[in-house]
Amino acid sequence: TSKWWSLSNATFLQWTMADVFGLLKYHPVPCFFAVSLLFFMGVEYTLRMIPPSSPPFDIGFVATAYLHRVLVASPTLNTVLAGLNTLSVFVGMQTAYIIGTWVIEGRPRATVAALFMFTCRGILGYATQLPLPEGFLGSGADFPVGNVSFFLFYSGHVAGSVIASLDMKRMHRWELAFLFDTLNLLQVVRLLSTRGHYTIDLAIGVGAGMLFDSFAGKYMKKAAATTDDA
């Protein structure tokens, strides 16, 4: 027989001071985020909105203002960095590794994750097409090439690198994962410096890589269970 809930059964009425201090001691991360929630609620409701006639405020652009000026003054350097980025982080190492885990090692999880991620990126990128950031520095060595149209939200470069790095860590390829994470960080700095992405594109790219890697893992587990049942 079920019982009706009453306020006297509320969990918080059973808390003691030891429980409160234990929360701070054993769960500092949620406590930190609780304080952060209150802080950013204050920031959000006191900050003035950016008017439609003004460019978006981006803290990443502010932090990389000097590097942006350097690249504006040196188009050759911008092209060299774009070429290195394309070959090392995106087209070269990232794509080769993710496809290689499937066709060579027989582990399709990273490939499935990348397919999930890029499909979702295409849908979201088309659904909300953000304006090109002011001061964008295109390059013929970039991917997508030159100034052709591309979706800003979210960064497929960053998300793909995260997917590859997570697979490396699962396989205990720690040195390679560290190299990929380092290159991805440098890629983030470069994309901000060239105004190729907003900060939110890059941050969500990290989260998307982790999310779709998790989705791919669940898909592979379910697919394996279905095959075993058959």
Please tell me what each predicted stretch does.
Residues R48-H68, I99-V189, F212, A216-A230:
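Membrane-interface loops
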Residues W4-A96:
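N-terminal transmembrane-helix/juxtamembrane module of multi-pass inner/ER membrane proteins
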